[in-house]
Swiss-Prot record:
Protein name: TPR repeat-containing protein C19B12.01
Superkingdom per UniProt: Eukaryota
Location of region: Disordered: 276-298, 386-413
InterPro entries associated with the record: TPR-like_helical_dom_sf, TPR_rpt, TTC27/Emw1
Alphabetized PANTHER family for the sequence: TETRATRICOPEPTIDE REPEAT PROTEIN 27
Organism: Schizosaccharomyces pombe (strain 972 / ATCC 24843)
Length: 817
């Protein structure tokens, strides 16, 4: 099946009169409805099959990708296919933007030839083809549409998932590479929407289907020119299966993008690994298929397998903090892909990933900037709007990108269209404007905000311009920009919402909501935040609810909605909110924690259910002591004493170094010790051993808390460690007697007397017990007891001698004579 060739007939450009379609042109233009009516009323719609419409839709989609992402420039002016009355540039652009706006979210206005995207979408919708391949391409279109919007929108997400679900039932009949390609695309979609756990599973499944073996491991090697010894380095070992068909895709390509050498006086161009195979990880831990891989001379990868490595790189970034360790883990994946230039698009993406990673190091930042500039120039040259006099998408202020690199000669480093598009859907490739905006964001991260501002102004990304002005504390300029642009386009809902943020005025949120016909979810979300900060939680929940009706994929909205519900004691609403948060991101420990808190107070849920929810939370917030503290308290309530001990240990590990004994929850520790002493027959039980290890961590932290020494003394006494028990009691007394308030505060004096009498009692009970090194614990226990009492009596004489506690000391001393 081939695409329809006569586009003027297809899209109504040959119409001499459009009076019968006036309803679609006034008061505003609705291109999709016009085309639907046109196709229904003309023989064309009846004589052309739905498959031909779908094939034409695929053609339009690839035209759009070619003009915005991959190049080379396509000198086709799609608006000439439309009726004459639709060809006014400004009016047509507004109509296209309006048709591509979803849930109030607009695509980038200056994206060249957006009409291709709209025509593709309209053709797919009209065709309604049942062919799995066409449904797959429709899902690809929807995902590309989503990537052009600022926020995730549920309408497109649902369409994508529905289409991919239909295709998944037919995938098993395809060859293994197509199965792997489909699974990889599904993984990228899930990762884009923040579902990285599922995405990771899909990527592993894709590798398994394609019989692609790879592993991140360690090998001995050298990173610098003057290094005299080998150290452990991360490396990705990967091997593609032998494909039967030796097609062009498996051969190296000479049409690779410009690649820059590092040219550093210290760092090697790439890591030099030790030639000895023993430098790799132990063979029993390594996939046998990879054991023959040489890190210095790896085998050539299939482009599809290389795409999968880059997809894994993307998931690692999403799953980990944005820090040096994460970048070190990502780098070997990109380096493995860059060994051989097997495909232009794959190689371009690998260079971009490496440039992103190298922008954070002083020795590699120069190559990072040069490489990113080269990739920008490559797109700028190949997507140049000025090549054809018929290009109508060139903005008036588009002066092109400034470059300090020489321009390539015509045809230099130019790949075929087929090579560029072949793996596009398996790579999250940025468009020209997205790449330039990314460069501007890099400038912001290093403090060059003014340079970023210039780029955003040239791209007419006014929301980013506003944010730059605000970061420079020039809110006045930000407001000027917003008001100027709103005069040109009153329906820019995002700018109107930003104006509300800057002026802290809710009327702008309301205006954005009303102008969007109550479809722009961020307006209600911002209004909800406004009321939340003011403390009007009920009104905030109402606003969040309106926002979530439009966009239920917004994790921040669900989370804040849940927090407001918790504060208002609406526990069912809170549970729903945090459950939705977890459906979006199952690894969000804070949502698990809040869900458990709501379950604890809800009528229809047990503490056991809350405990299980909290148990999930600590998996993902392992270093958060507050989460562990909550888990500890719930574990006490449900009598999970081993988990109480585990939580106490973890809290001490996190806080002990900075807070010392304050990191220990004395009450929980006391409860655990009591439980172990009552329920365990001896100190050989598992729980007793766990408690013993815990107390080994507690004892070095104790400085001034008498309660802790008393707990330790009681536990050692139960274990029949008499000397240790007596020593703990003595240390508790020393803390009391060292207080400067013993002679001035009667309460302190009474506590000290109590401690002294406890110590004397311990001497009497334990002094004659067997000691650690033979003999008894304290042979002279009476002498030591008298010394303790005399010392304390001497301190209290003339101050507390008329008190009852003082009389107790004298009486006890008399008994010891």
């Amino acid at each position: 099946m081939v695409a329809i060739e006569n586009k003027e007939v297809l899209f109504g450009g040959s119409l001499k009169s459009t009076e019968e379609y006036d309803q679609f042109f006034c008061p505003s233009i609705d291109i999709p409805k016009f085309l639907f009516k046109y196709w229904d009323s003309k023989p064309l719609g009846k004589n052309v099959s739905s498959d031909q419409f779908a094939e034409t839709a695929i053609q339009m989609l690839e035209y759009f990708i070619q003009n915005n992402y991959t190049g080379p420039y396509l000198p086709i002016k799609p608006e000439i296919w439309l009726p004459q009355r639709l060809r006014d540039e400004a009016t047509l652009k507004d109509a296209i933007i309006k048709s591509l706006t979803v849930e109030g979210e607009r695509p980038y206005r200056l994206a060249p030839k957006l009409l291709f995207l709209l025509l593709s979408q309209t053709l797919f919708n009209y065709a309604n083809s049942k062919d799995p391949l066409h449904i797959w391409y429709k899902a690809r279109l929807d995902f590309l549409h989503q990537q052009m919007l600022k926020e995730h929108v549920s309408e497109l997400f649902n369409q994508i998932m529905e289409g991919m679900h239909i295709v998944s039932s037919h995938v098993s009949s395809l060859d293994r590479d197509l199965q792997g390609r489909f699974t990889m695309e599904m993984g990228l979609i899930q990762s884009y929407y923040g579902r990285d756990t599922l995405a990771l599973q899909l990527m592993k499944e894709s590798a398994k289907v394609m019989d692609f073996h790879f592993e991140l491991t360690g090998a001995l090697g050298r990173r610098t020119k003057f290094q005299t010894f080998d150290t452990s380095q991360l490396v990705v070992l990967a091997k593609s299966r032998d494909r039967c068909k030796d097609t062009e895709q498996n051969k190296s390509t000479s049409t690779q993008p410009i690649t820059f050498e590092l040219n550093d006086d210290t760092l090697l161009e790439k890591i030099s690994f030790k030639e000895d195979q023993k430098s790799l990880a132990p063979s029993e831990e390594l996939d046998p298929i990879l054991s023959s891989e040489d890190p210095n001379h790896p085998s050539k990868l299939d482009p599809l397998d290389a795409s999968l490595l880059l997809a894994f790189c993307h998931i690692i970034k999403n799953n980990n903090p944005d820090d040096g360790l994460t970048r070190e883990e990502m780098a070997p994946y990109a380096e493995r892909v860059l060994v051989y230039p097997v495909n232009w698009s794959v190689y371009t993406m690998a260079l971009l990933v490496r440039a992103r990673l190298e922008g954070f190091k002083s020795r590699t930042v120069e190559r990072s900037v040069l490489q990113m500039q080269a990739l920008l120039d490559q797109l700028n040259d190949q997507l140049s709007f000025g090549k054809s006099p018929e290009g109508v998408d060139k903005p008036e202020n588009d002066e092109g990108l400034g470059s300090f690199l020489p321009k390539p000669q015509d045809g230099e480093n130019s790949a075929s269209l087929k090579e560029r598009l072949n793996y596009f859907y398996n790579l999250l490739m940025p468009s020209r404007w997205q790449l330039e905006a990314e460069l501007a964001e890099r400038f912001i991260s290093v403090g060059a905000t003014k340079s970023a501002l210039e780029i955003f102004e040239r791209l007419q990304m006014w929301d980013c311009v506003v944010m730059c002005h605000c970061s420079l504390n020039r809110q006045d300029l930000a407001v000027q920009v917003i008001k100027r642009e709103l005069e040109n386009d009153p329906y820019d809902f995002l700018l109107r919402t930003l104006l509300g943020d800057i002026e802290n005025n809710p009327k702008h949120y309301v205006e954005a909501w009303e102008l969007s016909c109550k479809r722009f979810a961020p307006a209600q979300r911002s209004l909800g935040k406004y009321y939340y900060k003011k403390g009007d939680l009920l009104q905030a929940m109402n606003c969040f609810n309106e926002s979530l009706k439009i966009n239920p994929l917004s994790y921040p909205t669900w989370f804040t909605y849940g927090c407001a519900a918790l504060e208002l004691q609406k526990y069912d609403a809170a549970m729903e909110a945090f459950s939705r948060c977890l459906s979006i991101n199952p690894e969000d420990g804070e949502s698990w924690n809040n869900l458990a808190s709501a379950m604890l107070k809800a009528k229809d849920h047990t503490k056991e259910q809350a405990w299980h929810a909290m148990q999930q939370g600590i998996k993902y917030m392992y270093d958060n002591w507050r989460i562990w503290e909550n888990y500890m308290l719930i574990s006490v309530d449900v009598n999970k004493w081993s988990e109480v001990i585990r939580a106490l240990r973890r809290i001490i590990e996190i806080k002990g170094k900075d807070e010392g004994e304050r990191a220990v929850d004395v009450q929980c520790l006391d409860l655990v010790v009591n439980y172990v002493m009552q329920s365990c027959d001896n100190d050989a039980s598992g729980l007793a051993r766990m408690l013993n290890e815990l107390l080994k961590m507690v004892v070095p932290l104790i400085t001034n808390d008498v309660r802790l020494w008393r707990i330790v003394a009681r536990y050692y006494l139960w274990r029949r460690h008499f000397a240790e028990s007596l020593n703990a009691t003595l240390k508790a007394y020393r803390i009391l007697i060292s207080s400067p308030n013993v002679t001035s505060d009667e309460a302190t004096w009474n506590k000290t007397v109590e401690g002294a009498l406890e110590l004397v009692e311990a001497y009497a009970n334990l002094g004659e017990m067997p000691g650690r090194m033979g003999g008894v614990v304290a042979k002279d226990w009476k002498f030591k007891s008298r010394s303790v009492l005399r010392s304390l009596i001497g301190k209290g004489k003339n101050i507390w001698e008329n008190t009852e506690s003082y009389q107790k000391l004298e009486s006890e001393l008399e008994n010891l004579k």
